[in-house]
């Protein structure tokens, strides 16, 4: 379960309750050995299609946009407003292509082997609010942060100030999960502020 290779790099984050029943189906009773994996034609076709979209997002979009983003973010001083806005939009495309591409590759590879991993991105840039965005963006991470960090911290069951602190803490750590750099720390904190304002209004 821990070493299931398709989703080790960037998710989706799979919980034991979702994955172990699928694994048990593939283990022979008595011997405990893994059954011979039979690749079904329908799973193969769909899996390859999902992986192809993942590679397209990652290698064609994310990897080709990355130099533009790096160039703008490495030295934003002196750049005009349009260039900075272009950098922000390009970064949004890059991060989506990167993470959703990786998870599509993982979902497709797992499906070929006969395992179903949960959908991880659901058109996040069509979200109508910050809360809706986090129901669509890196869904397995969002639900993990909610269940194992936000709710244990008290969620929204305590004072308003405590709720806002919980949101900021979770989003700060969520930003760090996406990448250990100041860009992602700021990204996470900004999302925490957006969620707090959305709850406030």
Please identify what each model-predicted range represents.
Residues 1-201:
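Membrane-embedded transmembrane alpha-helical bundles that form the catalytic cores
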């Amino acid at each position: 379960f821990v070493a299931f290779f398709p989703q080790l790099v960037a998710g989706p984050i799979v919980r034991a309750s979702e994955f172990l029943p699928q694994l048990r189906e593939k283990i022979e009773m008595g011997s405990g050995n893994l059954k011979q994996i039979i690749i079904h034609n329908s799973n193969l076709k769909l899996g390859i299609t999902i992986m192809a979209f993942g590679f397209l997002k990652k290698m064609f979009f994310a990897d080709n946009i990355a130099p533009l983003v790096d160039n703008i973010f490495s030295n934003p001083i002196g750049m005009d407003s349009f260039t900075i806005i272009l950098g922000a939009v390009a970064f949004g495309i890059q991060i989506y292509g990167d993470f959703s591409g990786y998870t599509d590759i993982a979902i497709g590879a797992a499906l070929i082997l006969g395992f179903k991993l949960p959908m991880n991105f659901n058109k996040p840039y069509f979200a109508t609010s910050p809360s809706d965005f986090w129901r669509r963006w890196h869904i397995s991470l969002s639900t993990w942060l909610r269940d194992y960090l936000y709710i244990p911290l008290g969620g929204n069951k305590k004072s308003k100030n405590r709720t806002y602190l919980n949101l900021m803490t979770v989003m700060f750590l969520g930003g760090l999960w996406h990448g250990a750099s100041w860009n992602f720390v700021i990204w996470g904190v900004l999302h925490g502020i957006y969620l707090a304002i959305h709850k406030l209004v």
